[in-house]
């Protein structure tokens, strides 16, 4: 399968059309951004690492009945995916208080939440991806109530599977972002699952092992991404 026309370029990936109208190629970049593109930089080999991690996790979820856009890993940076009509809703699942949840509600960072919190954000960079509820989403025409209920249920199911997977590899899944899209009258999980889209803390030390190291200039970004890759792929 070969790339034809570039369909889209985002902060972390490029998407290309192929000769098959149902399939696209997602190319992972090393570019890094934070705070809705206000901070920009690069993380060496990030695209390679994130493609490897995402491919493994999509395969895991597919085996557990979670339908995704993933078809196969084509190369170090390229992933073959089903074409999606992206739903403009970012779904965030939170297990431990961190990031904007701490700022909004005054939680102490690291507080284990009584139950996972599922949040919806409007996928719109110009508006800084604002938090929204179901009524906002319906009023904006980005999803129906039935679709939003499906997204919430699917996100909760993914959380159960991923929390257990990462715990076995001595990682806390603090929170993570999911994106979904429509494909042939079906809603599939899209985008990626990686240290770009998840917060990972070491199970024993609580060391941050994700893009927060880039966001807050903590150093050791490449090493953290590489360590997550080793644990996810069981590369001891």
Curated annotation (Swiss-Prot):
It catalyses: 5-amino-1-(5-phospho-D-ribosyl)imidazole-4-carboxylate + L-aspartate + ATP = (2S)-2-[5-amino-1-(5-phospho-beta-D-ribosyl)imidazole-4-carboxamido]succinate + ADP + phosphate + 2 H(+). Belongs to the SAICAR synthetase family. Gene3D superfamilies: ATP-grasp fold, B domain, Phosphorylase Kinase, domain 1. The gene is purC. GO terms for molecular function: ATP binding; phosphoribosylaminoimidazolesuccinocarboxamide synthase activity. Keywords: ATP-binding, Ligase, Nucleotide-binding, Purine biosynthesis. This is Phosphoribosylaminoimidazole-succinocarboxamide synthase. GO terms for biological process: 'de novo' IMP biosynthetic process; cobalamin biosynthetic process. Signal peptide: none annotated. It is an enzyme of class 6 (ligase).
């Amino acid at each position: 399968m070969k790339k034809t026309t570039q369909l889209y370029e985002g902060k972390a990936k490029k998407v290309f059309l192929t000769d098959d109208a149902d399939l696209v190629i997602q190319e992972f970049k090393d570019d890094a951004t934070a705070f809705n593109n206000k901070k920009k930089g690069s993380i060496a080999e990030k695209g390679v690492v994130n493609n490897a991690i995402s491919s493994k996790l999509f395969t895991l979820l597919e085996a557990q009945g979670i339908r995704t856009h993933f078809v196969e890993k084509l190369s170090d940076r390229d992933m073959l995916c089903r074409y999606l009509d992206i739903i403009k809703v970012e779904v965030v699942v939170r297990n431990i208080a961190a990031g904007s949840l701490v700022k909004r509600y005054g939680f102490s960072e690291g507080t284990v939440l009584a139950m996972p919190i599922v949040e919806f954000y409007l996928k719109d960079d110009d508006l800084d991806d604002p938090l929204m509820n179901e009524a906002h989403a319906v009023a904006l025409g980005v999803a129906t109530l039935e679709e939003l209920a499906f997204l919430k249920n699917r996100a909760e199911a993914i959380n159960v599977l991923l929390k257990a997977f990462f715990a076995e590899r001595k990682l806390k899944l603090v929170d993570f972002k999911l994106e979904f899209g429509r494909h042939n009258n079906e809603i599939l999980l899209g985008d990626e699952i990686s240290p770009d889209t998840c917060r990972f803390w070491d199970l024993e030390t609580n060391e941050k092992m994700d893009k927060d190291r880039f966001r807050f200039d903590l150093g050791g970004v490449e090493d953290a991404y590489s360590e997550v890759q080793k644990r996810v792929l069981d590369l001891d």
